[in-house]
Amino acid sequence: MLGQLVGGLIGGHHDSKKVKGTVVMMKKNALDFTDLAGSLTDKIFEALGQKVSFQLISSVQSDPANGLQGKHSNPAYLENFLLTLTPLAAGETAFGVTFDWNEEFGVPGAFVIKNMHINEFFLKSLTLEDVPNHGKVHFVCNSWVYPSFRYKSDRIFFANQPYLPSETPELLRKYRENELVTLRGDGTGKREAWDRIYDYDVYNDLGNPDQGKENVRTTLGGSADYPYPRRGRTGRPPTRTDPKSESRIPLILSLDIYVPRDERFGHLKMSDFLTYALKSIVQFILPELHALFDGTPNEFDSFEDVLRLYEGGIKLPQGPLFKALTDAIPLEMIRELLRTDGEGILRFPTPLVIKDSKTAWRTDEEFAREMLAGVNPVIISRLEEFPPKSKLDPELYGNQNSTITAEHIEGKLDGLTIDEAINSNKLFILNHHDVLIPYLRRINTTTTKTYASRTLLFLQDNGSLKPLAIELSLPHPDGDQFGVTSKVYTPSDQGVEGSIWQLAKAYVAVNDSGVHQLISHWLNTHAVIEPFVIATNRQLSVLHPIHKLLYPHFRDTMNINALARQILINAGGVLESTVFPSKFAMEMSAVVYKDWVFPDQALPADLVKRGVAVEDSSSPHGVRLLIDDYPYAVDGLEIWSAIKSWVTDYCSFYYGSNEEILKDNELQAWWKEVREVGHGDKKNEPWWAEMETPQELIDSCTTIIWIASALHAAVNFGQYPYAGYLPNRPTVSRKFMPEPGTPEYEELKKNPDKAFLKTITAQLQTLLGVSLIEILSRHTTDEIYLGQRESPEWTKDKEPLAAFERFGNKLTDIEKQIMQRNGNNILTNRTGPVNAPYTLLFPTSEGGLTGKGIPNSVSI
């Protein structure tokens, strides 16, 4: 320290040299366009001497005037700013910058930037080309920098050399600590657009009590009855009528909902997102206009009526010339509108499930196959006792055990008895009974009329599943304590019995669609990841190796979740309008969260818990599947193992002992906050890792990355391919099963297709739902996929870079294996009767509606 003090006092006497650098930045923009007026005012400020300055911070030379922290260099400024032409289209611009440097200053470890212009800009990076005795120093920034008067403290960026807290150069430690203090905020005040503060709140902003009782919604989180993961705090004032509810912003300002500035969509993604929405709105409105002149404006009269949503449209020119022209257009929105992938304008794209055959979706084989390779392949479980038993409290709900009997399924088990089939791991169940029964009575007071379902299936010798029976249950009319009334349906393909069987499968699909959207998709990926995003930014410095590991897997998550709270999962939002639980949807997801267990989100643990795999140390991934041809599980285990190998290599480079884990104060604070605040309603659960060993860190990070990337991809990007044709996965049922002797039963006999369509999702709901899932199923053009990074220089450490390259190569190998499996005719579940190859866990993709690709994060 004495040497540093002396150096700081005498350093100015040494000859100064120049170090040149390159700054890459993007000016303020509106979608695809640069804000030209803002650019002009910035040039005026520049001419008046109000510039953008950079000061390097030494990691070896202290400054007595600055509390012996790292010494600052003289300010340097963007070169030729006034002479650089402002591009019309939003994009990156590189500027030179030259710093004074002397030998005592040594290696810069950080820099301070001050923006004296009037507008913000996006700072991508600063690269110092040749620091004497050191070489290139790279700073990955990727942050919006607002005018300095917007900040209470300096904006600081660190070089790409990771450090554990105890290894941080002493002169940089205070800067590291202060930056985290800034990001945490003080928990007060309304957040503004330029804020960078990450904080927590409960879901108290879904309702709007100021607009009447029908818009009141239960607060999710902070109670034993309705526990929930926390969301990002906005600090908006409370509503007038309920001080515990947060007020909402007007719908027209939805895109302005607060998230920390660097969590907002980039301009390319925002352009794509709005373009997809625009196209879907047009596709939604036109059929509605046609319906005004239809005798049954809110009904599809036939399956041909439904198919007209997809066929036709305005086809754009094809070929290399037109593609070259559109690729040359600098504006992303126009490029997306003129896509040349075969989609027509003004019509929905044909969903994959009906591309090859318009009727194969109705087969029992396809109905069962989608439980293994569809959009919700995470529910099916092995049947371990017959008949199935309920776990609901009998004091509250009476006898909820299944009424399926041996007579319903015997004779369909390829010569096996029920006990033999169970012991041979041949019987499986899709069980939505216990999840729905507590809410079903209330749900059926709305326009929804549906059941809680159990579906039994038999694993055949060819690897495919055969439905055996469907049980549909309603709460007992005399009260919950009396249990349920149930009816069991068995397969038939003839006459009215065949039509009833098709309806029974539709009720199962309605159940599965709602559980998928609320639980498998929203709760188990979007909602549970957000606390990890917040805690990582609050407790792990950008210098921390684990921050660098996890950061790509949090991209855009807070923004898409905030938009969901604003327009999708709110009272009267799109989700309530299109899924069967209606206004009870989010409350129901909170009850399900009571049973959420973080370690069980690991794919091997999930498969074992559902009984579709058993632990087996001799198997490649530590588990052996009991359904060999289970596309989601087979591909998923390959992806899981690749992620775990990568995380193991990475974490092992930084942590070699339990002691290093325990003494890492940032890591311990991060994990404590995840447990006690972010997922605070489950803080006392015994299954949380103690974070005392490198293996606990590896397991936890692997699970976080799996949830954010592959699990989300598996349950999201198949939405349009499988549910874009609503008869295959209806989201609502409006009528109960027709009973003999009723007009509905007679219609079912005379016109079964029309009776089917009058039972499931109505025309308006169908169009709204299809419009939504088309948007959610598309990849934006700036997507970053598993095994990719936004910057190749995300870390300076060579061993992690080499491990990451191995990870990418492994994913490429997995892609080849997936293609080989899809081409294997013996694996019938890979494509099924609809001839739809399973590609949802294929790591990479192009932009658009592709049905493949694993983005790094929950980004849509």
From Swiss-Prot:
> Which cofactor does this sequence's record say it needs?
Fe cation
What is this enzyme's class at the first EC digit? oxidoreductase
What pathway does the UniProt record associate with this protein? Answer: Lipid metabolism; oxylipin biosynthesis
Check the record and name the InterPro entries matching this protein: LipOase (IPR000907), LipOase_C (IPR013819), LipOase_C_sf (IPR036226), LipOase_CS (IPR020834), LipOase_Fe_BS (IPR020833), LipOase_plant (IPR001246), Lipoxy_PLAT/LH2 (IPR042057), Lipoxygenase_dom_3 (IPR027433)
Per the UniProt record, one Pfam family is Lipoxygenase
Give the cofactor note.
Answer: Binds 1 Fe cation per subunit. Iron is tightly bound.
**Expression across tissues:** Expressed in germinating seeds as well as in ripening fruit.
GO molecular-function terms, A-Z: linoleate 9S-lipoxygenase activity; metal ion binding; oxidoreductase activity, acting on single donors with incorporation of molecular oxygen, incorporation of two atoms of oxygen
Q: Which SMART domains match?
A: LH2 (SM00308)
Q: Please name the CDD domains in this protein's record.
A: PLAT_LH2 (cd01751)
Q: What are the BP-aspect GO terms?
A: fatty acid biosynthetic process; lipid oxidation; oxylipin biosynthetic process
Which residues does the record give as Fe cation binding sites? 521, 526, 712, 716, 860
Q: Where is this region: Disordered?
A: 209-246
What EC number(s) has UniProt assigned to this enzyme? 1.13.11.58
- Kindly state the subunit structure of this protein: Monomer.
Which PANTHER family does this one have? LIPOXYGENASE (PTHR11771)
Q: Which family does it belong to?
A: Belongs to the lipoxygenase family.
Q: What is this protein called?
A: Linoleate 9S-lipoxygenase A
Q: Which organism is it from?
A: Solanum lycopersicum
- Gene of origin? LOX1.1
